[in-house]
Amino acid sequence: MSSDPNFSLTSFLECLSQIEHEFLRDKVENPPVLVRKLQELQQKTPGHVASLLHDPETIQQIHQTAHRIEVAVKVFIHIDQKFTSGCSEVVHGTSKVMQEVNVGSPAVGCRNLSEDLPAYHMRKHFLLTLDSPYPTQEEKEGLVRLTNESTARVGLSNATRPPLEVHQLTLWFINARRRSGWSHILKKFAREDRSRMKRLVRAKLSSSTQSSPPSPMPEYPSNNLDNILSDNLGRPLTPADKQQFEDDWASMISWIKYGVKEKVGDWVYDLCAASKKTPKPGMPRPVTTVAKRQPARKTKPAAKPNSRTANPRASTTPSIDSTLDSSKLESTPELSMCSTADTSFSTFGSSLSMSHYNPFQDGNDILQSPTVKARGNRKVKALPKRAGKQQPDEVENGKIPFLCLSVAFV
């Protein structure tokens, strides 16, 4: 800027144009120089404004130049703020990614965490957020992605295992809080209050060799562990209470770091995969039920109730012409009335009319039959005392042999 004591609107405009030009060049050494020139211009202008000639055109150019400088300054300030915010987000995102893929050095609390355990990434997140193991939706999706990628990268033998889903991860955290003992500590030593649990966990982590979670809570100052336990219990802390808390804490950390034998393991996936396979022809289908694993107990069949109806008596009268065993014949009330007759004559109903048949025309042949001689000393069973009435349709249909009727009435 000119040091001429004669101050004018033209010199003022030239000074502003020079500042604008140097500001837009954006050199590292320019900001201090520009600030100094603006300060000098601010000091000279108020004393010469009243004596300046009124030149509307020059004044308009001065306003336009000042407006351009103001707009450029606001843009540069906005760019600088965005750049600073972007750098912070990049640094935070890079640190988060490095922690997820375990590129950087692991935290002190995760050094003993076995990578061979199932749900390694979920256990690690549980340990890092021990004060509040309730992952957000974004964190759940990230853990699901990491778990599925690590499973595919390791190349487990169980290739048919379905990928992990968000709702399964949510159930895992619910079970982990319960099975590890975190919920028990929350209920017994924090009055089921999450804010008290956060203070308790942070106090415990700060008093031990384990690292505290990466996001400290400034609204809760670091207090003594014994004081927090006493406040949560609502009474003076006893050595038994302190020992019980230490035991529960050690059990919880042990479950998270080292794990326990899972109740449901890989055999569930194997069983589901085997049930979907098509069995080969001729091979039995395996059924994994309790009845198949253990031999079935043989039970005695229930005895049939004794019927009070009389069993039909079999006639022991031998057949004259038939060679069948008479023990296989069953008796009927009609046959019992004429048990001394030969029942084989009933077979003549289809080929010979019974009305023209005389059973005694060959009497000598019958007496000479070897069957009659062999059974001459047989005993005839007693007839039933009361015989049922004979229905007329039975006689018409030929159910009662004609020979029996002839013997009965002769």
Curated annotation (Swiss-Prot):
Residues 111-410 are annotated as: Highly conserved between B alleles. A motif (Nuclear localization signal) lies at residues 276-308. Residues 306-336 have a biased composition (Polar residues). Pfam families: Homeobox_KN, Ustilago_mating. It is found in: Nucleus. Transmembrane segments: none annotated. Residues 1-110 are annotated as: Variable domain between B alleles. Residues 375-388 have a biased composition (Basic residues). InterPro entries: HD, Homeodomain-like_sf, KN_HD, Ustilago_mating. Residues 107-184 bind DNA. Residues 202-225, 278-336, 374-394 are annotated as: Disordered. GO terms for cellular component: nucleus. SUPFAM superfamilies: Homeodomain-like. PROSITE patterns: HOMEOBOX_2. Residues 333-410 are annotated as: Not essential for B7 function. Keywords: DNA-binding, Homeobox, Nucleus. One of its GO terms (biological process) is regulation of DNA-templated transcription. One of its GO terms (molecular function) is DNA binding. It comes from the Eukaryota. The B locus has at least 25 alleles, and any combination of two different B alleles yields a multimeric regulatory protein, that activates genes responsible for the pathogenicity and for the sexual development of the fungus within the corn plant. Belongs to the TALE/M-ATYP homeobox family. This is Mating-type locus allele B7 protein. It comes from Mycosarcoma maydis.
